[in-house]
A protein has these predicted regions:
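Low-complexity, intrinsically disordered terminal/linker segments enriched in charged
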Residues: 120-124
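Sensory/regulatory domains in signal-transduction proteins
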Residues: 29, 33, 37-119
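Sensory modules in modular signal-transduction proteins
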Residues: 1-35
């Protein structure tokens, strides 16, 4: 079975927004959570547009610095972008690399820190 089916499912099942971009900052994929979160800016229609359209000049500069750092060494793969106290989450920019470790793009990773208080193994 083709692994891409599994990888896409992992991305789609994640409840955190995932936005994948190529090296030209083109949004190549949004998972369902990202499409919903960024609905105010176009949601799923953002695929194919530039991530830079959504950022101010300072943010654009920081994204470019991240990409330069990623490109400088194959071991440079994650940058802590911000902490959002309202949502109790950290946001990271993560390098995407091919099998030869060549930089191919990046994505924004949201890690929520609020404990899930739901019942374990509750099948509803």
């Amino acid at each position: 079975m083709e692994l891409n089916i599994f990888f896409r499912s992992v991305l789609e099942q994640d409840t955190a927004p995932i936005v994948l971009c190529d090296l030209e900052h083109t949004i190549v994929y949004l998972n369902s959570a990202a499409a919903k979160r960024y609905e105010y800016a176009g949601g799923a229609a953002l695929v194919g547009t530039s991530l830079m359209n959504c950022h101010n000049s300072h943010s654009k500069e920081l994204v470019e610095k991240c990409l330069a750092w990623f490109a400088a060494d194959e071991k440079n793969n994650i940058v802590h972008e911000s902490y959002n106290p309202k949502e109790n989450k950290d946001v990271y920019i993560v390098a995407l690399r091919d099998q030869e470790k060549k930089l191919t793009g990046y994505y924004e990773k949201h890690e929520y820190r609020t404990r899930d208080t739901g019942e374990f193994y509750k099948f509803t």
